[in-house]
Amino acid sequence: MEALPSNLIFHELIGLYAEVFESTNPKLINICGRVIDETRNMLIIETEDTHEKMVPKNGTTFVFHLPSSSADHDQRVKIFGTLLLSQPENRVKNIRKIRMR
């Protein structure tokens, strides 16, 4: 399934480029890089200088860059981290339940 703005909260986030847009912790704002791992409460982002930053989902707003078919620019989607609070494998399964309704 392709990652679209409408289904991104149910999609696999590992491998997507992400930015921290807002956070309750000001030190986390503007962290950006590839999502390399995800837990129930955290995204682990590998920055350009290959450091791994653990960013809590709760209290954080992320901007994800979705690759587009045109090489000009990626599509950007802003998502509140609280919408992502669940185990990644369960969140991916939830889209099937919603489609069956």
Curated annotation (Swiss-Prot):
Catalytic activity field: Endonucleolytic cleavage of RNA, removing 5'-extranucleotides from tRNA precursor
Which GO BP terms, alphabetically? rRNA processing; tRNA 5'-leader removal
The entry's cellular-component GO terms read: cytoplasm; ribonuclease MRP complex; ribonuclease P complex
Q: Which InterPro entries match?
A: RNase_P/MRP_Rpp29-subunit, RNase_P/MRP_Rpp29_sf, RNP1, Rof/RNase_P-like, Rpp29/RNP1
Q: Recite the UniProt keywords alphabetically.
A: Cytoplasm, Endonuclease, Hydrolase, Nuclease, tRNA processing
Q: Report the GO molecular function annotations.
A: ribonuclease P activity; ribonuclease P RNA binding
Under which EC number(s) is this enzyme classified? 3.1.26.5
Q: Principal place where this protein is found?
A: cytoplasm
The record's subcellular locations are: Cytoplasm
Q: Which SUPFAM superfamilies match?
A: Rof/RNase P subunit-like
* Record's function text: Part of ribonuclease P, a protein complex that generates mature tRNA molecules by cleaving their 5'-ends.
What family is it from? Belongs to the eukaryotic/archaeal RNase P protein component 1 family.
Quaternary structure, from the entry: Consists of a catalytic RNA component and at least 4-5 protein subunits.
Its name, as the record gives it, is Ribonuclease P protein component 1
